[in-house]
Amino acid sequence: LATASTKEADVLKTLLLTSKNAQTVDVVNKVIGSADEKTQLALLDVLSKRSNPNSAAQIFNLLNSSNSTVKAAAYTALPNVVNDKDFDKIIEVLGKADAKDVNAAQQAAIVALQNNADKSNIVKRLSANISRSLAPSSARYFPIFAGEGSDESLKTITNYISQDNPLRADAIKALASWSNTSSLDALTTLLRTEKDATLFSTVFDGFIRQLNASKVNNDQKTILLKDAFEYAQNTRQKNTALGSLRATGTYSALAFASRFLEDKDLKGTATDVVMNITADNKSFIGTDVRQWLEKAQNNLSGSESSYLREAIVRHLAEMPKGESYVSMFNGKDLTGWKGLVENPIKRAQMSAKELAAKQEIADKKMRENWKAEDGSLVFSGHGDN
């Protein structure tokens, strides 16, 4: 390897990676420490792809190499060779690592913790250790909690998201990159309260990713995505929330997307959502659906537009007559809405005159507490309506 050309070195590495000799990795482990720089770099690449439990010790040694190139390669290989028993050693390495090597050390810690039999106790111990400090270095451990993903880890990180905490930004970043969907509630709260544009962007992207991956039912997902759209601070975020509605397949998502079929910044995404939801739900029929599809058809452009137009024409031709869904709310005003008068038994005991009088009072109260706003029905009061 020391005298091999680049092409020859690649061939030799392939041989080491594919060798059926059970001793191959042991030989690599044995020689890597004393090899020249070129050989060490080649063998580090091999160990990052093929290793055994004894490989970690050699990598840890090379993390202290005076050769910066070898040291960097050793950090790159570290997550691929660590064992469960190495966790404490990795934490020690993480505490001393240069900024450019921190991510590799964090990933190695996550790997060593993932299937560790003592994982719960390790997390509690690590949580207790960092809880005593607000030093910037404590944030180095946040991605480990995010990667582990337990309730204990979530509790640890949410302790840092108060407005006056100096590690708040790092904690938010950890919540947004959580390895499962358990941080969704925390992200939902932050979505509705975070004002800083940079932090909001982190929260928003994490929220959308977590919500899409969650087991939240499609109707609730639709509501949350519509919320995300309203809180979005720029066009990219609005398109992201709008596009995610496609997977919910709900009529509410379809109707919401249809509102943006003529918006110059959003009509491309809205068109995609409308076409796909209607194509996947043949029961969505009626005048509104026809009009939305016709608008979507007019928005199409590009190499596939003719094919997609034909698909819409065919869909419209096959669509049964009639209405599948009639909204109680017209999206504009409170026409047809009435306040609730008592219960059915009491109403039945009232005279027509008494009922009419009480209905007038209930309607007035209803209009004080409810209003149509931006296509939504909004409750703004504290009554029983």
Q: Where would I find each of the regions flagged by the language model?
A:
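Residue-level detector of extended alpha-helical repeat arrays and alpha-solenoid scaffolds
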Residues: A9, Q40, A56, K71, ...
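Alpha-helical, heptad-rich or low-complexity scaffold/stalk segments
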Residues: T3, D10, T76, V93, ...
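Amphipathic alpha-helical scaffolding segments comprising HEAT/armadillo-like alpha-solenoid repeats
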Residues: L1-T3, D10, N21-G33, Q40-L41, ...
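Short inter-helical turns and helix N-cap capping residues of alpha-solenoid HEAT/ARM repeat scaffolds
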Residues: A4-S5, A35-D36, S66-N67, A97-V102, ...
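Core register positions within helices of long alpha-helical scaffolds
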Residues: V11-T18, A22, V46-K49, A77-N80, ...
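Repeat-solenoid scaffold signature
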Residues: N67, A72-V82, A169-D185, T193, ...
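Hydrophobic beta-strand residues in large extracellular and virion-surface proteins
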Residues: V28, L43, A74, L126, ...
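Carbohydrate-interacting regions of secretory-pathway proteins
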Residues: N298, Y307-N385
